[in-house]
A protein has these predicted regions:
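C-terminal output helix
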Residues: 117-127, 138
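The feature encodes the CheY-like receiver
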Residues: 65, 97
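Acidic catalytic/metal-coordinating carboxylates
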Residues: 41-45, 68-74
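Receiver (REC) domain active-site loop signature in two-component systems and cognate sites
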Residues: 64, 76
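Two-component/phosphorelay signaling modules centered on CheY-like receiver
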Residues: 20-38, 107
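Short hydrophobic/Thr-rich beta-strand motif most characteristic of the beta2 strand and flanking loop
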Residues: 34-41, 49, 113
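Active-site residues of response regulator receiver
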Residues: 61, 93
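Active-site beta3 strand of CheY-like receiver
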Residues: 53-59
């Protein structure tokens, strides 16, 4: 495997974005590396999916109609770990600059990913986040 290639086989990613094109392109990027992607359109759907499916990684847009990514990460972090409260998460957003990055990290996301994102950059961040997911590090390292 070349250094820029990531193996995401078996990594369950929950993607939330209200834009159909973004959902389709990001899901396709991650599936290229073997991730299993569940894509939803709203923060409410994402919160329910976190509790129901316990994804390994959460990728969320920040600006969505009704409730956005900040609302979502606040609700996720308020959950007990066994219900998804410790799910590793990244904000995938068009909001750029150090002030937005700082706000994202303070809110409870581990990464701030600026749109547009390259295939390999996205895969690397998801790979890093997956290593921090409960039970995933061993599964990834033994491949």
């Amino acid at each position: 495997m070349r250094p820029y290639e990531c193996d995401l086989r078996g990594v369950r990613v929950l993607l939330v974005d209200n834009c159909k094109l973004v959902r389709a392109s990001v899901a396709s990027m991650l599936e290229h590396f073997g991730a299993v992607v569940t894509a939803v359109t709203s923060a409410d759907e994402a919160l329910a999916a976190v509790e129901r499916e316990h994804p390994d990684v959460l990728l969320s847009d920040l600006a969505m109609p009704d409730k956005g990514g900040y609302w979502l990460i606040g609700k996720v972090r308020a959950l007990p770990p066994e219900r998804g409260g410790a799910t590793p998460a990244a904000a995938l957003t068009g909001f750029t600059g150090p002030e937005h990055r700082a706000s994202v990290l303070r809110a409870g996301f581990q990464y701030h990913i600026e749109k547009p994102v390259t295939l390999h950059h996205l895969a690397e961040i998801v790979s890093i986040l997956a290593l921090t997911a409960p039970g995933m590090a061993a599964a990834i390292l033994v491949r």
